[in-house]
């Protein structure tokens, strides 16, 4: 008899030996929520029962498809309670295919061939502007080309308007000399040269270094005159 009573007492107090769960740990908390969600699925859902009651045989056959293609027809045919919330159709495109398409679009955005295909002007390209006034000698495209050819060989000339043109020199030093000589409009000619590339206008040190040794004498005299007048 003593053995039976002792065994029953051990069975009663066997749960006291277990340690309490520490819900501060994320693993224990996730496991608890998983068990609760599984138990919640086992509970009876009256809304789904009413939904299933409205289905016909055709709808049942169509609802066998995991995409639930026949539910829209059920909603259009019967006036169901507003409390029933139906999830929208899942996208038929698989996840791996969607990732491939996203990677392709990202690669197209980062494609370096697009910048290579667009023809950018060379570094030695400048923009020339001049004004025509009655009291001062008139300037035209021929006279502008003759002036700029004194700095070095010209590769191409593109007319932008009546009083402006884009000139591309063959070398960088010639372009630096032209820009440094005609940075501002002189009162005698109203003639101005500037860089077509925006970042080149900020790099004044490079243009000064190039023009100190390779600037023609005529340009030096014109720059000195402008400096004295200012």
Curated annotation (Swiss-Prot):
One of its GO terms (molecular function) is nucleic acid binding. It comes from the Eukaryota. InterPro entries: Nucleotide-bd_a/b_plait_sf, RBD_domain_sf, Tex56. SUPFAM superfamilies: RNA-binding domain, RBD. Pfam families: DUF4523. Signal peptide: none annotated. This is Testis expressed protein 56. The gene is TEX56.
